[in-house]
Amino acid sequence: MNMALTLFTNTALASLLVLIAFWLPQLNTYSEKASPYECGFDPMGSARLPFSMKFFLVAITFLLFDLEIALLLPLPWASHTDNLTTMLTMALLLISLLAASLAYEWTEKGLEWTE
């Protein structure tokens, strides 16, 4: 009951904050806020240069793989558990997911810079 109440309270509070942020209007919209700022000087060039989507996708892929590898870090401490088969099954499942996602990225040419 305590856990359910905590989850409900957290969900309700997060939803309330999202709704407030969504429905609150942008009160002060000045042109100065939308202009680029370069240490008080006039901008040398356009601050709205197109961003490389390939770089963005590789960065997101790196973050996902980094998160999955971070999930593997507690495995040495988990090996001291009484239920070793469950731990090994979960570790194998996590490593399989990591290998399958790497294979998918490789076949979709998501790791190549030259294209």
Curated annotation (Swiss-Prot):
Quaternary structure and partners: Core subunit of respiratory chain NADH dehydrogenase (Complex I) which is composed of 45 different subunits. Interacts with TMEM186. Interacts with TMEM242.
Give the superkingdom in one word.
Eukaryota
Q: Name one GO biological process term.
A: mitochondrial electron transport, NADH to ubiquinone
Q: What class of enzyme is it?
A: translocase
Sorted alphabetically, the keyword list is:
Electron transport, Membrane, Mitochondrion, Mitochondrion inner membrane, NAD, Respiratory chain, Translocase, Transmembrane, Transmembrane helix, Transport, Ubiquinone
Q: Where in the cell is it found?
A: Mitochondrion inner membrane
Q: Which InterPro entries match?
A: NADH_UbQ/plastoQ_OxRdtase_su3, NDAH_ubi_oxred_su3_sf
Reactions catalysed according to its record:
a ubiquinone + NADH + 5 H(+)(in) = a ubiquinol + NAD(+) + 4 H(+)(out)
User: Cellular component terms, GO, for this chain's entry?
Assistant: mitochondrial inner membrane; NADH dehydrogenase complex
What is the protein name for this chain? NADH-ubiquinone oxidoreductase chain 3
From what organism does this protein derive? Phoca vitulina
The record's section on PANTHER family has: NADH-UBIQUINONE OXIDOREDUCTASE CHAIN 3 (PTHR11058:SF9)
GO terms (molecular function) for this protein are:
NADH dehydrogenase (ubiquinone) activity
